[in-house]
Amino acid sequence: MAHKKGTGSTRNGRDSNAQRLGVKRFGGQAVIAGNILVRQRGTKFHAGNNVGIGKDDTLFALVDGVVTFERKGKSRKKVSVYPAAAAAEAVAG
């Protein structure tokens, strides 16, 4: 038998790099237009007011303002950005 099995398995030892997904700007944080708000696979969070969506489902701010996380129906979550002046009204009501 010419098989060598004494050094352990060499078929393991690989792993892929992390995708670094998740929320990048949280509720109440000030953002500028173009800031990435959420990196995601699929639409766990939906785009709300003043938020764009990229081809990989990344949500980003379209205007300068403050981030708010809101509910859209029972189960949907949406992310909106309100200009600084309007943000106080949106958070209050």
Curated annotation (Swiss-Prot):
Instruction: Give the record's GO CC terms.
Output: cytosolic large ribosomal subunit
Cross-referenced SUPFAM superfamilies, in alphabetical order? Ribosomal L27 protein-like
Is Ribonucleoprotein found in the keyword set?
yes
Tell me which Gene3D superfamilies the record gives.
2.40.50.100
Task: Provide the alphabetized UniProt keywords.
Answer: Ribonucleoprotein, Ribosomal protein
Q: Might you name a Gene Ontology BP term for this protein?
A: translation
Q: Which PROSITE patterns match?
A: RIBOSOMAL_L27
InterPro entries for this protein: Ribosomal_bL27, Ribosomal_bL27_CS
Molecular function, one GO term: structural constituent of ribosome
Give one Pfam family.
Answer: Ribosomal_L27
Q: Which family does it belong to?
A: Belongs to the bacterial ribosomal protein bL27 family.
From the Swiss-Prot or TrEMBL record, give the protein name: Large ribosomal subunit protein bL27
Originating gene: rpmA
